[in-house]
Curated annotation (Swiss-Prot):
Source organism (scientific name): Pongo abelii
Name listed for the protein in its UniProt record: Aldehyde dehydrogenase family 3 member A2
Record PTM Phosphoserine, positions in chain: 293
Residues bound to NAD(+): 185-190
Its membrane topology: Single-pass membrane protein
Gene for this chain: ALDH3A2
Enzyme Commission numbers on file: 1.2.1.3, 1.2.1.94
Gene Ontology molecular function, alphabetical: 3-chloroallyl aldehyde dehydrogenase activity; long-chain fatty aldehyde dehydrogenase (NAD+) activity; medium-chain fatty aldehyde dehydrogenase (NAD+) activity
Amino acid sequence: MELEVRRVRQAFLSGRSRPLRFRLQQLEALRRMVQEREKDILAAIAADLCKSEFNVYSQEVITVLGEIDFMLENLPEWVTAKPVKKNVLTMLDEAYIQPQPLGVVLIIGAWNYPFVLTIQPLIGAIAAGNAVIIKPSELSENTAKMLAKLLPQYLDQDLYIVINGGVEETTELLKQRFDHIFYTGNTAVGKIVMEAAAKHLTPVTLELGGKSPCYIDKDCDLDIVCRRITWGKYMNCGQTCIAPDYILCEASLQNQIVWKIKETVKEFYGENIKESPDYERIINLRHFKRILSLLEGQKIAFGGETDEATRYIAPTVLTDVDPKTKVMQEEIFGPILPIVPVKNVDEAINFINEREKPLALYVFSHNHKLIKRMIDETSSGGVTGNDVIMHFMLNSFPFGGVGSSGMGAYHGKHSFDTFSHQRPCLLKSLKREGANKLRYPPNSQSKVDWGKFFLLKRFNKEKLGLLLLTFLGIVAAVLVKAEYY
């Protein structure tokens, strides 16, 4: 691992990844890979998660293509130096911020959306001019092998490499020094990544998860609400980091919500859900058994059918869920939807705030003041009102968590910023030295007054006239001296 990282760092130090033209070429090559090898990509993801080609394309491929196009369109503007506002002391100088690549980036991908959650941060890292080591999740084995095969055929083989393996390989990778680590996964591993990064003072972006609440107000159209929740919850068999994890609603709404979700599930997946090409499977047997354990002691309103041989768990809704039970203590990451009755919106807000900050918050109501109130009085990585998941689709938004749901953000310009150092640059002249006398010893009260005037905009009114006359005299002297030389 050490040799691989050293090789990538040497490639970065060559400066090859920095020019705008090179970055654009690599992004175009990545787009070409997605377009030319679409069938290989679809097949690999389908094999890992039993996804239909339509779901793979709509949930992963199209997002990657959109992100690349967005970068290609905007990158020439983003890489340019940006002038900044100057103060009196620097008014004759050149002051700007220059985005600069961080260096060698490690991207540790996720298994639930193994293509988009690995390639999307890669797009940002390339756009920012970095070298990258990509570590796909070993749980999505077919996608990991596909990335290791295809990426070297299209991208610079020295600057961008794929390393496959399990816990042992990842642990060894984390011992190496990187300039940024980008991790997508669960909170427990996120802490391990952050601890390893701290040994080298390496900054991290942690895209984690959590229990994303969904509050349903009594003042809304339940038919529409339940269709949108059903789509977001059971997409990818519930294995989505921003899927609605549980519902908060008044007890009087519970039976209606159950019935409407049940009818929507039939509409989406048919009478025999197990045979639907649009309904995926749990990634492996370990996660299958973990999810089943969450059903113990729960009141199943509908669903609950399972098949261990195919890792099938039917869309399931639980009612009257006790907040102290296991299903409410950890992120579900599966097709189980608990309903927790609350008395009103006040209790819902308190319920959310008493727990770890979620990756997403969903609020359904015709009353936009209520939605705004929940936004103002809670904290989460992102919010969507009257829908679910959709804030992920807007690449002008930063996507990321807060607290235990993560740190840092990406997508669009936010990806470029995450993988860039905003370097402040001040260029002064070696002339006009007379204007610098105020900052050189010996010090005096008049110099303190000048400092207040220039830097703090605080001054003694009685001395204002004298200060202004002195300032004008210095400026005149500087100009005369500059003209003389």
